Each structure stands twice: as structure tokens, then as C-alpha cells.
Curated annotation (Swiss-Prot):
<dbReference type="Pfam" id="PF00126">
    <property type="entry name" value="HTH_1"/>
</dbReference>
<feature type="domain" description="HTH lysR-type">
    <location>
        <begin position="1"/>
        <end position="57"/>
    </location>
</feature>
<dbReference type="InterPro" id="IPR036388">
    <property type="entry name" value="WH-like_DNA-bd_sf"/>
</dbReference>
<dbReference type="InterPro" id="IPR050950">
    <property type="entry name" value="HTH-type_LysR_regulators"/>
</dbReference>
<feature type="DNA-binding region" description="H-T-H motif">
    <location>
        <begin position="18"/>
        <end position="37"/>
    </location>
</feature>
<keyword id="KW-0805">Transcription regulation</keyword>
<dbReference type="GO" id="GO:0003700">
    <property type="term" value="F:DNA-binding transcription factor activity"/>
</dbReference>
<dbReference type="GO" id="GO:0005829">
    <property type="term" value="C:cytosol"/>
</dbReference>
<dbReference type="GO" id="GO:0006355">
    <property type="term" value="P:regulation of DNA-templated transcription"/>
</dbReference>
<comment type="function">
    <text>Positively regulates the expression of ytmI operon in response to the availability of sulfur sources.</text>
</comment>
<dbReference type="InterPro" id="IPR036390">
    <property type="entry name" value="WH_DNA-bd_sf"/>
</dbReference>
<keyword id="KW-0010">Activator</keyword>
<dbReference type="Pfam" id="PF03466">
    <property type="entry name" value="LysR_substrate"/>
</dbReference>
<dbReference type="GO" id="GO:0043565">
    <property type="term" value="F:sequence-specific DNA binding"/>
</dbReference>
<dbReference type="InterPro" id="IPR000847">
    <property type="entry name" value="Tscrpt_reg_HTH_LysR"/>
</dbReference>
<dbReference type="InterPro" id="IPR005119">
    <property type="entry name" value="LysR_subst-bd"/>
</dbReference>
<keyword id="KW-0804">Transcription</keyword>
Amino acid sequence: MELRSIKTFHTIVKFGSFYKAAEILNYSQPTISMRMKQLEQDLGVLLFERGKSLQLTKAGKLFYERTGDLLMQYEALKHNLSDLKEEEAGIINIGVSEPTASLIFPEILKDFLMDYPKITVNIKVDDANTCSQKLLDGTIDFAVCGEPELILENYYHPFFYDTLNVIVSDQHPLAEKKAVHLSDLAEERFIFTPANCPIRLQIEQHLHRELGNRYKKMELTSSMSHEYYVRENIGISIFTSTAHSKPFNGTKVIPILNLDITPPIGLLTNQKEVHFDRATKDLIARITKRFQQRSKELEGTSDKTITG
């Protein structure tokens, strides 16, 4: 029994004649008749009453009722497969903030693009507020970033909370310490991100409460460049554990015991984009899973610091 025979049967019933069905399906009438005869042979029952008017037998009525859902499911499946084909050749535009863009995203995309070789992924590396604006403008599909300033049309869902450490040159006196308090950082030169960075503002509030004016500062707009300046002992930098998750020669990462700032990383979406295609949903799931793993890694590091 072929699916095209079932479709032909439904067309005959719908339009009330073999002749009309032949016109609709672009077949000859003998072909239609032969197909129905073969279908009846396959089923072992008569579907039509033989006579002047087209009428269904009891078996024909039952077959018509039960196969209606089958045809609907088949059409839905064809539609889904068509969507899938389009997804596999689509484009995903993503906004990503540092250090996620440099240190986390490459390993996620490597596996994703192996599974979706026809997908084109474009990465826009920006801070959280710029990602939020690009999402509003429609130039990106979603973003993975810190928490931006509130915009009514955009939704932010944090799925990871980072911790902060201080990074120093391995020639710096603090490099001998396993952990520090903020008071240990008095009179140091801090290398900061720009003043409009939310985490920078929080860090400076804590420093000011603890040290007053007993520290110096300089700005470096490229967050991923800080460790190069630190290595030359130009200053020290307070940054996320993720940013310094991979060892950088000539530097030392030290936990800060009394700095209770946990910068979030999360998914930023727009209310208009509530229905992502399958490939995009899969990519978001992989991103979330990777940051769940990162949370466990941080917990393990924290336990070692406490017991050490």
C-alpha cells in the first residue's frame, strides 16, 4: 500500500469522482482506476460501491476516517523536514562579550559546526549594553553577555555567576600569597576596563570603601589585553575567573577573600524572537550546558582554595 494511493483515494472522495481526481492530480483516469483497484487488493476489501453514483462501502468509510490523520501527519512531517533543511543552511548572528568570546565560545562552536556544517555563525564581540542595542536593532539573533542596562523589549536570563580574582606579575611581591584581602592591595596601580563598565563601578566602590584613595588606576579598553600589561608589572588587574581560566606565562592569579561580587553571564533575547529554529535552540542548549560545567569547575577551584 503506497501513500500516494491513499492520497488519491482521499482526492476521489473529496471531489466525488474519479474523473475530477484525475484532473486535480494530473493523472489519466485509467491510472486512477488502476491505483484504486490495487489499493483494494492490498487491503483485501472493497472501498467503493460499484454503481452509477460514487459511494463508499462501510470499509471505505472507515479507511477514509482513519487515514485522514495519517495524511495530516505526513504533510506535517514534510513541513518539518523542509524547515530542517532550511535551518541547516541558515545564518545565526550572535552577540558575545569578552572573555566568553575568546575563551569559551570557540570550543562550543567547534562541535556545533561539525554537526551543522551548512550553518553560518557570525559573532559580534561587544559589551553587554552594545549587544542589547544590536538585539533591539535586529542585527543579532541573541547574545551571551553580562547583564546590560534594562531595556523593556529585551529579556536577560543569567545562567552563570563568575567570581573575581586579582592577577599580578609573577615578579610582584603579592605573587607569593595564596589569597589576599582588599587591604593587601593598597597603593597598587589597578588596570581597569572603561568607566561605563558595570563591574568596574562595583569594584571601585569596594576599593573605595576599603582603601579610600590609597590606590592608583589606569584604563585599558581591551579587557583581554590586561594580562599583557600585568606581566610587565605595570599594574594589577581584578578580573573574572573565566578571563584567567587558562594560565598566562609571567602572571599569577590570586583569589580575593573579601570581594563579594559575582558577575553574571546569561542569555539576552528580544521579545520578538520567542521562537528560535531547531539549530539555534540546540546552540543555546550547548552554551548553557558549557556554563553549567564551568560552574562546577569554579566550585572545585573554590574548594581547593579553602582547603589549601
